[in-house]
């Protein structure tokens, strides 16, 4: 029985997560920038797992070259939604629902996830280079 080499999906998965993290960071930065804007409601993006399930269920058109037809980007599948009001913070008198402490915590989470993503890609790339050199 002949074994064929399967394509390595780690780089694609890491790229998709990096794009999702970028969109999430943009949404969190918008929340922080509008912390004093009256009636602004904090937003967040759909979880990465939900985005991956949505993109995996889409059937793409077969093509011989990736440059021939533009594929929908992951960003189109990331839903930005209003955050539910945090009961600890509540709604401010101005109608604003942004909690700076919560948004800064999200920023830290995003940085940690991005650093882990970059470290995994770097380690896997190094491992592939060592394999090729042998």
UniProtKB/Swiss-Prot annotation:
Per UniProt, which keywords does this protein have? Bacterial flagellum
GO cellular component terms given for this protein: bacterial-type flagellum basal body; bacterial-type flagellum basal body, rod
Give one GO biological process term: bacterial-type flagellum-dependent cell motility
| Localisation per UniProt entry | Bacterial flagellum basal body
For the keyword Transmembrane helix, the answer is: no
What superkingdom heads the lineage? Answer: Bacteria
Q: Which NCBIfam families match?
A: FlgB, PRK06003.1
The similarity comment for this entry is:
Belongs to the flagella basal body rod proteins family.
Describe its function.
Structural component of flagellum, the bacterial motility apparatus. Part of the rod structure of flagellar basal body.
Q: Tell me how this protein assembles.
A: The basal body constitutes a major portion of the flagellar organelle and consists of a number of rings mounted on a central rod. In Gram-negative bacteria, at least four rings, L, P, S and M are present, whereas Gram-positive bacteria lack the L and P rings. The rod consists of about 26 subunits of FlgG in the distal portion, and FlgB, FlgC and FlgF build up the proximal portion of the rod with about 6 subunits each.
| Official protein name in the record | Flagellar basal body rod protein FlgB
């Amino acid at each position: 029985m002949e074994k064929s080499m399967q394509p390595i999906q780690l780089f694609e998965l890491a790229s998709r997560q990096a794009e999702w993290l970028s969109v999430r960071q943009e949404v969190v930065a918008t929340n922080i920038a509008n912390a004093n804007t009256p009636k602004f409601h904090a937003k967040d993006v759909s979880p990465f797992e939900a985005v991956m399930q949505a993109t995996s269920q889409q059937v793409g058109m077969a093509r011989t070259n990736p440059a021939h037809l533009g594929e929908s980007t992951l960003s189109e599948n990331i839903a930005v939604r209003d955050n539910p009001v945090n009961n600890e913070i509540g709604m401010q008198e101005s109608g604003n629902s942004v909690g700076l402490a919560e948004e800064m915590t999200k920023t830290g989470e995003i940085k940690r996830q991005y650093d882990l993503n970059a470290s995994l890609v770097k380690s896997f790339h190094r491992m592939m280079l060592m394999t090729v050199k042998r």
